[in-house]
C-alpha cells in the first residue's frame, strides 16, 4: 500500500465526496448497525446531509474543514472538523468537533484512519478541547477513538429520521 495523501477538500470535490459519504454511511448504518436502523431512516438522513449541493455549501463554510485521505488517487476516507462547536459536556473556550469521520472498509486496519485522525487533530489548531459523538453500540469506532486519546465524557442523542439513538461523547485534551 502506498502512503495516504491528505488534502483539504475543495468545492470541486463535492460530487465525489457526496457519493463517498452516501456509500460509507449507508454501509455503516444499514449493514453494521446490528439491524437497528430502518432503511427509511438511513435514507432520510443521507438525503438531508450528504447531497452534492449540501457538500458544496459545507466545503466553503469557514467553520468547517473537510480533510480527504487518498491512497493511490482513490478516496479512502474523510474527516470533518467543526470549529467553535460546543457540547454541554465538553468544557472549553475553543472547542472543535470531529463532526464526521469515515474510512472505507478496504482501508480499515491499514493505518489510514490513524493518520487521518492525526490530520484532524492538527487541523483543530489552537483548540483547547476536541470532541466527537459516536454511536454507543459501535464498539470498533469507540475503541479506535480511545486508542487516539479520546475519553468518554458524557452522552447525547442522535436523530436519524424517526430513530433516536444514544451516542457517547468522547473528548481529547490537546494540551
Label every PLM stretch briefly.
Residues 92-99, 128-175:
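C-terminal "cap" of GNAT-fold acetyltransferases
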Residues 2-5:
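Extreme N-terminal starter segment of soluble prokaryotic enzymes
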Residues 74-76, 106, 110, 130, ...:
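Generic detector of intrinsically disordered, low-complexity, polar/charged segments
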Residues 8-12, 19-108, 114-123, 173-175:
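Acetyl-CoA-dependent GNAT
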Residues 12, 16, 139-140:
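Short alpha-helical
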Residues 15-18, 82, 133, 161-162:
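Glycine-centered flexibility motif
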